[in-house]
Amino acid sequence: MQGGILCTPDLRTNSAIDLGRARWSTPAMSDLAPFAEDTRRTELEAAQAKALRLFDAIERDGLIRPGVTEREVQDRIGELAAREFGVEKHWHKRIVRSGPNSITIAGDNPPDRTIEADDIVYVDLGPVFEAWEADIGKSYVLGKDPQKHRLVADLPRVFAEVQAHYRKDPGMTGAALYAFARDAAAAAGWRFGGKIAGHLVSEFAHALIPGDKALYRISPENPTPMSDPDGKGRARHWILEIHLVAPDGSFGGFYERLL
């Protein structure tokens, strides 16, 4: 609980964005200096830790509060990330979704709305720290609604359950892990809101890794082992996304971290 707001507990996102369509004014991945395989996970974990500190600063400054629009919060987060963390680019758009917009996924573009006093709000950020992508999703309850509090409390618990299942068998397919995540959400009393349950993350930009992009997502369309190497022959590093939605579709919450 911070400033009277309950937020998703940390364990130290639904992206339907077509990453293949993204463009950046940066060198292609093939032009970047290669990174040693044994350091890549360490660097991604360091980027995630920095992103979590960015969330700490967002909460410190009270950016998520009633009376401001989602777009205003997105803009202020961008300013904060640049000012205090030196973030010059984000590999995906900054996402703030509140109230009925909290059931939407990253690829949606719902109308901007003003955050209200009893809202649930989720934030999904993809800052790039030096060469490394982070991807963090976190949810907040602004009021006292017990169902919203229960959903936000369930997010990291369901995440941990799905993560533990994967770690028992890293060779499972993306489709199998998606199905498990969907079933875990249902067992907790929620709908699984995402078309995917995660995706690759890497040196910026993972969208430039060669190969079929469907195989780089945790989704029903990925029948291949998640332990397979990527299109450059390297280990794949995954983000796990948990998007829980109320059975009546009135609100949802989002949580993501490295798998």
Go through each PLM region and give its residues.
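Extreme N-termini of proteins with methionine-enriched Sec-type signal peptides or N-terminal signal-anchor
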Residues: 6-7, 29
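Active-site neighborhoods and metal-handling regions in enzymes and metal-associated proteins
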Residues: 23-259
